[in-house]
Amino acid sequence: MLQEFVIAAAAGGSNPSAALSQMGFEHLITEMTSSPGDFAVSWVVLITLIAMSAASWYWTVINIFRATRLKSAADRVTTAFWDAPNAQDAIRAMEEQPASEPFSKIALDAAQAAAHHQRAEGSTGGMGESLSRSEFVDRALRQAVTRESTKLQSGMTLLATVGATAPFVGLLGTVWGIYGALIKIGATGSASIDAVAGPVGEALIMTAIGLFVAIPAVFAFNFFSKVNSSVIAKFDTFAHDLHDFFATGSRVR
């Protein structure tokens, strides 16, 4: 269809250079601002894409800081736990960690479960009779790992949604721009570049913006998916070692 526009424009003898100067982003914004009612759909598309881009970059930055913090904290916290001479000192070391630190929270949950089960062992009909110490600690660790793993997924759904839908939002602007070009041709009776350059330029720009929003979101989603998988594997390994320590008293380090 665009090829037909160019052929018709050449036959009409219009000035392509002047027409193509109307296809820039600055010209599009000027037209949208001067007559917002005529560009209602374009405004909706543009604002939606800007909001999607802002949200995806926000969660990208948040995940970068979180991944950096977890990478430095993983070995530090686990080493602090296993280097403690006894369980009391290990628990105290975990309590000194920041409240948002996941490895220390997993260790504290395991310690609390073991202590709670020990207190209940002497009670009649308590959980000490229904669940063994190993089972009780294992359940607490599973819940802790699941909780902390879920927190790692914050923003991931949004990144996936932006990466999957932003091109189609931009495509909506493309379709609407070409539709506007056809309406303009019907109203003026001219298929010259002068008549269609603005709407077609708008269409192409909206497509480019949609891709510009989607591509970083897709890269971020794939990168953080890999990072989160690595962190979750460390959660599982630490939880397994904690289970052996609190359930049987054996140290892995």
UniProtKB/Swiss-Prot annotation:
Where does it reside? Cell inner membrane
Q: Name one GO cellular component term.
A: plasma membrane
Question: Record's Pfam families?
Answer: MotA_ExbB
- GO BP, sorted A to Z: protein import
Provide the topology term for how it sits in the membrane. Multi-pass membrane protein
Q: Which InterPro entries is this protein grouped with?
A: ExbB/TolQ_transport, MotA_ExbB_proton_chnl
Which keywords does this chain's UniProt record carry? Cell inner membrane, Cell membrane, Membrane, Protein transport, Transmembrane, Transmembrane helix, Transport
TM regions (residue ranges): 39-59, 163-183, 204-224
Principal localization? Answer: membrane
Q: What does this protein do?
A: Involved in the TonB-dependent energy-dependent transport of various receptor-bound substrates. Protects ExbD from proteolytic degradation and functionally stabilizes TonB.
Subunit notes for this chain? The accessory proteins ExbB and ExbD seem to form a complex with TonB.
* Protein family according to the UniProt entry: Belongs to the ExbB/TolQ family.
Protein name per Swiss-Prot or TrEMBL: Biopolymer transport protein ExbB
Query: What is the native source organism of this protein?
Result: Xanthomonas campestris pv. campestris (strain ATCC 33913 / DSM 3586 / NCPPB 528 / LMG 568 / P 25)
